[in-house]
């Protein structure tokens, strides 16, 4: 896989707008329960951060369940090249990182896993652009604020943003209006009202 193929993969599989659910440290049973809850609400993108052996088990189980129903599961918090291999072995569809590491991007592409590196500055956006990447995670989005996205879209109109970190169902629309393509949330999936609001982003007429 090269950067162009990675960009095409994201364009084909990420909606406009879209929502991604992040399930960190829940263990296998609870992660599966929450993933099914998200999928039932129409949220097809799920990220399982891999920071412990139990996280890897949760990723593998969720990826297997998602594969059977056409849902995409990412390995998140990928901070080493070894994580990339672990993600591939456990069936991850793509890889999400908190920061931008050129060696991890290269490892992902070599493994056939679309990379979604994290950025928070114009310099990092320019590096990602130089690598041929068009899709990035912006973290921590709530700290940066929605205006960050509207301002940075000016010099980087070709970039596609996945806003992550501190977002809620209430704040998500502001970020989408600022040019974000995908909003990523965590505990909001456990709240009925927030889940309904997030589902409404995907089906505004419902």
Question: What do the PLM-derived regions correspond to, one by one?
Answer:
Residues 1-93, 110-111, 168-170, 177, ...:
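Conserved N-terminal beta1-alpha1 strand-loop-helix module at the mouth
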Residues 24-27, 75-81, 97-101, 117-122, ...:
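Glycine-rich beta-to-alpha transition loops that act as phosphate-gripper elements at the mouths
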Residues 42, 91, 99, 112, ...:
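Conserved functional loop/turn residues at catalytic and ligand-binding sites
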Residues 44-49, 88-90, 111, 121-149, ...:
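Glycine/Thr-rich beta-alpha phosphate-binding loop at enzyme active sites
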Residues 46-49, 74, 95-97, 118, ...:
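Short beta-strand segments at enzyme active-site cores
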Residues 85, 116-122, 126, 131, ...:
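Catalytic alpha/beta core domains of metabolic enzymes, predominantly
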Residues 94-107, 137-148, 178-201:
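Glycine-rich phosphate-binding active-site loops on the catalytic face of alpha/beta enzymes
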């Amino acid at each position: 896989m090269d950067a162009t193929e990675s960009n095409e993969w994201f364009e084909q599989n990420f909606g406009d707008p879209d929502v991604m659910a992040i399930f960190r440290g829940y263990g296998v049973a609870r992660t599966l329960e929450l993933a099914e809850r998200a999928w039932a609400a129409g949220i097809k993108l799920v990220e399982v951060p891999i920071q412990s052996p139990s996280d890897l088990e949760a990723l593998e189980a969720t990826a297997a369940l998602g594969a059977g129903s056409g849902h995409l599961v990412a390995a998140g918090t990928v901070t080493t090249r070894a994580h990339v291999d672990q993600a591939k072995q456990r069936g991850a569809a793509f890889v999400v990182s908190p920061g931008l590491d050129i060696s991890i991007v290269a490892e992902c592409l070599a493994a056939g896993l679309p990379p979604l590196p994290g950025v928070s500055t114009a310099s990092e956006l320019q590096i990602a652009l130089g690598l041929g990447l068009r899709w990035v995670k912006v973290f921590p989005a709530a700290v940066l604020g929605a205006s960050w996205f509207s301002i940075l879209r000016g010099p980087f109109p070709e970039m596609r943003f996945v806003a992550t970190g501190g977002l809620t169902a209430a704040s998500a629309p502001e970020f989408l209006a600022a040019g974000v393509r995908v909003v990523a949330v965590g505990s909001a999936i456990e709240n009925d009202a927030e889940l309904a609001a997030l589902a409404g982003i995907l089906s505004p007429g419902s």
